[in-house]
Amino acid sequence: MGRLILEHTLQGHKGRIWGVAWHPKGNSFASCGEDKAIRIWSQSGNTWTTKTILSDGHKRTIREVRWSPCGEYLASASFDATTAIWSKHECNATLEGHENEVKSVSWSQSGGLLATCSRDKSVWIWEVAGDDEFECAAVLNAHTQDVKRVVWHPSKEILASASYDNTIKMYAESALDSDWDCTATLSSHTSTVWSIDFEADGERLVSCSDDTTLKIWRAYHPGNEAGIATPDKTTVWKCVCTVAGQHSRAVYDVSWCKLTGLIASACGDDGIRIFKESSDSKRDEPTFELLTAEESAHEQDVNAVEWNPVTAGQLISCSDDGTIKIWKLQE
């Protein structure tokens, strides 16, 4: 068994903290929350301190922040229905179009596309058209309820979204007319899907839900060895594993480490749990076991967790309790 060692507890935000995001270099991170401010933190010596506070971009709670793959830009999604793009401590662009709260924002791996989603049930795809210019490339209305999270595939221009309608949707650009289409609907959860994350190679996806489970989904491409039918020659996603009985309340976030393959979950029971794929796991019927659980990681709901993209085993979390914590996994 492994265990999580608490390395740092950081305070600075007023009220609940909704999101944290590691910089691609892994040596700094951004945080956001109820106080309408974004904080950029970096390490000097053995302490983490706020280097910058970005406070003039939004009128309401900031739900999520995400760095561009190059690390030059930061996008923030807010309940004020806008998404702001920041560079060098300035707000360079504000993306408007959603009718109400923007819940999530994500950059494609190339950095050329941005996705946003909202309580208005829509997913928007934006093209980076030049210096601080963003053009709406698509408005996708595949979900029937509030959309909670958008995440791009790690190498392909495929987008995944998770919703209050209990489903996950996949989108890709059509080769025929360059329109964006919903290519798959992933149904198995029995309540809101709060978050999703791809495995490093993008062939599997983990999801977490209000139904207290995690699910692992696998992509089956046309001509797959398993003999899974692929109508219209499109990739089919199947739920190949359900992790149940490990969380006592809603699971709000999940992070699949691109370095170690470990999965971290953030839960409404104030806990953080780490899952590891079993050594005898089968390709089409994988099994994941609980490696370690930090039952009282925070004093209130844990809203987000994210593995450091560079430093294996380092995990960041944030909570309604107004703190950010940095953990080190000892296996």
UniProtKB/Swiss-Prot annotation:
HAMAP family: ciao1. It comes from Drosophila grimshawi (Hawaiian fruit fly). GO terms for cellular component: cytosolic [4Fe-4S] assembly targeting complex; metallochaperone complex. It comes from the Eukaryota. PANTHER family: CYTOSOLIC IRON-SULFUR PROTEIN ASSEMBLY PROTEIN CIAO1-RELATED, WD40 PROTEIN CIAO1. The gene is Ciao1. Gene3D superfamilies: YVTN repeat-like/Quinoprotein amine dehydrogenase. This is Probable cytosolic iron-sulfur protein assembly protein Ciao1. The keyword Repeat applies.
